[in-house]
A protein has these predicted regions:
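C-terminal, charged low-complexity interaction regions
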Residues: 2-63, 67-68, 255-364
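Aromatic-lined ligand-binding clefts that engage carbohydrates, nucleic acids, or primary amines
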Residues: 148-152
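Domain-level detector of nuclease and nuclease-like folds
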Residues: 211-274
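Extended, Lys/Arg-enriched charged tracts that mediate electrostatic binding to polyanionic substrates
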Residues: 154-160, 167
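Short cysteine-rich clusters marking metal-coordination/redox-active sites
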Residues: 159-162, 205-208
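Cys/His-enriched microdomains
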Residues: 157, 199-203
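Histidine-centered nuclease catalytic patch
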Residues: 164-200, 214-229
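N-terminal accessory alpha/beta regions
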Residues: 2-145
Length: 364
């Protein structure tokens, strides 16, 4: 199985092809992208020096271009390892990361600050990060290395963001294909220099990638290669109305919530941002009520009801309370097995299943 057993966590130590993926991706980058970085530094520095004593260009504007040159030099110094670095932001402090995202931020029908500076310095736009590290340069399904091959080798079968949908690989005309999207955790519109970085790629379902996450800034969110909701202590919980619903005392409406109380502020903020960016509160709040009700009824209610219906057939045997309890336990274990496998294999709704069972102190 893959490394997505915990909701939103990708454990690369459990991805058997990870070293092969890193090797192939770094070789592709070194051949196709890296040579252009050297050229970009040379061309940008030349225009920067030409404008160094231009009084019409402010110090602030010169500083923006200078810091972009410094970033490219850092990237160049990593050679083929840049796109497979775990530490995506080098040793940059938060202020520098915020500065880079600010000058590179692209909005509809509006140039970024960096684009404006390129115009002022008369620097060719092909050296802008959106073009230099363009995701479009990474083939979809052609060539020796492409997105579909990467996704297939990762073998992640369930969306790490929501853990609700399968993302499957398949073959078509002897070619590997997948139903997954390859999402950029740090969006291309804010961090274009990370558009080709392996540790910025998150295999995801189309709903999480397109409808919810989009290009929202995720800098202060749960980063799937490092942590999960479980790691930070966030749990699914139900509202108390579910008890009345299961007992059949009244037809109540209950909700599924994500509880993260009593956590430190930094972790709280990460969880809040992740829930908001992915719309997890919306998709889980009521969408899986029937699943939760069936889960609890199957384990807590139906085995006993089933046994009661068998009493007439096994009347003498079932008068022994000890034997009766053993039979009930046996039935419950049979019912639990599919849920146990769901949790162990990281199948859709695995975390939801485990958290709700924990909430009701049901051992699985």
């Amino acid at each position: 199985m893959n490394g997505a057993k915990k909701m939103i966590r990708i454990d690369v130590s459990k991805i058997k092809n990870w070293e092969l993926i890193k090797e192939k991706h770094s070789e592709w980058y070194y051949k196709k992208i890296f040579p252009q970085i050297d050229i970009a530094i040379e061309k940008i520095e030349k225009e920067y020096q030409n404008n160094e004593f231009n009084t019409k260009v402010t110090y602030e504007n010169k500083n923006i271009v200078k810091r972009y040159i410094d970033l490219l030099k850092k990237i160049k110094s990593e050679e083929k390892n840049f796109v497979i670095k775990e530490n995506l932001f080098f040793d940059y402090k938060v202020d520098e990361i915020n500065f880079l995202s600010k000058i590179m931020k692209k909005e509809k029908n509006k140039k970024s600050i960096l684009e404006e500076m390129f115009s002022s310095f008369k620097i060719d736009e092909e050296y802008l990060p959106y073009n230099l590290f363009s995701y479009d340069k990474f083939p979809n399904h052609t060539g020796k290395w492409n997105r579909h091959k990467l996704l297939s080798l990762m073998e992640i079968e369930v969306c790490p963001y929501c853990q609700r949908n399968y993302i499957s690989s398949f073959e078509e005309n002897n070619d590997k294909r997948t139903t997954a999207d390859l999402d950029h955790f740090y969006p291309k519109s804010l961090y274009p220099f990370l558009a080709l970085s392996l540790y910025n790629f998150i295999p995801s379902c189309q709903i999480c990638n397109s409808r919810f996450k989009g290009s929202k800034d995720t800098y202060n969110s749960i980063y799937p290669y490092e942590e999960s909701f479980d790691d930070l202590g966030a749990k699914f919980k139900t509202s108390k109305e579910i008890i009345d619903e299961i007992l059949g005392e009244k037809d109540s409406e209950f909700f599924i919530n994500i509880d993260y109380g009593n956590l430190k502020d930094e972790d709280n903020k990460k969880i809040q941002n992740s829930i908001s960016n992915l719309g997890l509160d919306k998709v889980y709040k009521k969408s899986h009520n029937h699943y939760i009700k069936d889960l609890l009824e199957n384990i807590e209610k139906y085995p006993k009801n089933y046994l009661e219906s068998c009493i007439e057939i096994f009347d003498e045997y079932c008068k022994d309370e000890n034997k009766k309890e053993k039979i009930i336990k046996y039935f419950i274990d049979i019912v639990k097995e599919p849920y146990r496998k769901r949790i162990e294999n990281g199948e859709p709704l695995a975390k939801l299943t485990k958290d709700i069972l924990d909430e009701f102190k049901i051992k699985i």
